Amino acid sequence: MNKDAQMRATINQKLIETGERERLKELLRAKLIECGWKDQLKAHCKDVIKEKGLEHVTVDDLVAEITPKGRALVPDSVKKELLQRIRTFLAQHASL
């Protein structure tokens, strides 16, 4: 395992141990619902299913189709807030 992968694993473990990972996931979930992201993605899924027909779409197809759009639709403000929370966490646990 290279140094970056090892550092990521250590940080992830610390996020899990402290419960911060779950708090970050909840924050993200709430922010995405609040900004309408979830509704936009749901509508996009419906459009894809209508376009291709229910019988011709698998879950994997749907995921492959909507993932790029889903990532692109996450508002910068949400990304920045989450990144700031992660940076704050890392600063508080600098001994990693």
Swiss-Prot record:
InterPro entries cross-referenced by the UniProt entry: TF_ENY2, TF_EnY2_sf
Q: Which Pfam families match?
A: EnY2
- Keywords, alphabetical: Activator, Chromatin regulator, mRNA transport, Nucleus, Protein transport, Transcription, Transcription regulation, Translocation, Transport
| GO function terms (MF aspect) | transcription coactivator activity
The answer on whether this UniProt entry bears the keyword Nucleus reads yes
Keyword rRNA-binding listed? no
What does the record give as the function of this protein? Involved in mRNA export coupled transcription activation by association with both the TREX-2 and the SAGA complexes. The transcription regulatory histone acetylation (HAT) complex SAGA is a multiprotein complex that activates transcription by remodeling chromatin and mediating histone acetylation and deubiquitination. Within the SAGA complex, participates in a subcomplex that specifically deubiquitinates histones. The SAGA complex is recruited to specific gene promoters by activators, where it is required for transcription.
The family note in this entry says:
Belongs to the ENY2 family.
Quaternary organization: Component of the nuclear pore complex (NPC)-associated TREX-2 complex (transcription and export complex 2). Component of the SAGA transcription coactivator-HAT complex. Within the SAGA complex, participates in a subcomplex of SAGA called the DUB module (deubiquitination module).
Q: What is this protein called?
A: Transcription and mRNA export factor ENY2
* Species the sequence originates in: Taeniopygia guttata (Zebra finch)
Gene behind the chain: ENY2
